[in-house]
Amino acid sequence: MTLTLNRQLLSSRQILVAFSGGLDSTVLLHQLVQWRTENPGVTLRAIHVHHGLSANADAWVKHCENICQQWQVPLVVERVQLAQEGLGIEAQARQARYQAFARTLLPGEVLVTAQHLDDQCETFLLALKRGSGPAGLSAMAEVSEFAGTQLIRPLLARTRGELEQWALAHGLRWIEDESNQDDSYDRNFLRLRVVPLLQQRWPHFAEATARSAALCAEQESLLDELLADDLAHCQTPQGTLQIAPMLAMSDARRAAIIRRWLAGQNAPMPSRDALVRIWQEVALAREDASPCLRLGAFEIRRYQSQLWWIKSVAGQSETILPWQTWLQPLELPAGLGSVQLTAGGDIRPPRADEAVSVRFKAPGLLHIVGRNGGRKLKKIWQELGVPPWLRDTTPLLFYGETLIAAAGVFVTQEGVAVGENGVSFVWQKTLSQVKAG
């Protein structure tokens, strides 16, 4: 057996290898080290993710360090914590791994992982168990986009048995994760109990599922082409999805558009039931409603006749953040980012006797620049087109008990700089907040 060097891998000169220390990634790294010897211009690094789930995790790190030192491969060790609500341990671990991969990738690097044919078969069967359509049944692609670069799986056509033969022939050492024998995990149940029976009855079952996955991928790619114009017509430059153009579509066409829109938001694929609920409970909710459907750590909302995909963030209406050192940035709660006052702008700086704070609600009638008369904050949000989910998470700058400005939205008449150098109230948002508005 030799490594399948596809064109993308052959053209890559900087490679980051996901290295768990197990059989699969050990064989992959070994073959890439050999390939590097034949191609001196190739830069090879490895990353090991420490999940903290096993008592042996520290020993696995040491093993990977020893192997990489022996093979002269720089190793990055990323320690992660699993705390994503609504996901099982398997999904949490996978999400944490790929987040670590994305953080570690250097410009120009590609990520290479060691999934093989048996993994592909298990992925297909898991998708089948979930009732997935062609997108889910496509399983894993040999080359896919990831974190602004490429994710390459060069062993996808090889069986685990072939990898083991390679490892034994070359005297390789690898670790065995004890959790791989726990069949309470779905993938392990398939690997230990189901697939061996299928392979015993039909020896080429894994190859057949790989062909089916490839056919599903072809069909999905064709649908992407056929629906590209519809999606472009429905999607706004801000990444939201207009509801009106979808009203006349068939249920199947509309569902396909919504799936592709969500895929563009890097959202997990919703179930068929979730797609129905997105349309019936969110898109078609009564006009005066503010519908919301939560999917994992995200929400689908409707606002201004558009669907929005946003990160779930707890409201902060009762939060008051004293800002005594207002010359320095202030970190906001709930992953909302930070705020700072920067030189140059139309907001007056605070006087020495004014305590500065950041809040998320303001009582009474407010007088803002550009509007005549006083208005309650709720009315101002509505007039300025601020989505409901941002109204109690948008930072408000106070001097004493006086509202001065809403970050990026408005300045009050009491906050205007007159005859003095002004400042700007700048909100450094997280990525999810930027996408949400």
Curated annotation (Swiss-Prot):
Main location per the UniProt record: cytoplasm
Binding-site positions, ATP: S20, G21, G22, L23, D24, S25
Top EC class of this enzyme: ligase
Keywords: ATP-binding, Cytoplasm, Ligase, Nucleotide-binding, tRNA processing
Compartments in which it is found: Cytoplasm
CDD domains per record: TilS_N
Entry superkingdom: Bacteria
One of the record's GO cellular component terms: cytoplasm
EC number from the UniProt entry: 6.3.4.19
Annotated family: Belongs to the tRNA(Ile)-lysidine synthase family.
Name under which the protein is recorded: tRNA(Ile)-lysidine synthase
Species of provenance: Escherichia coli O6:H1 (strain CFT073 / ATCC 700928 / UPEC)
Gene name in the database record: tilS
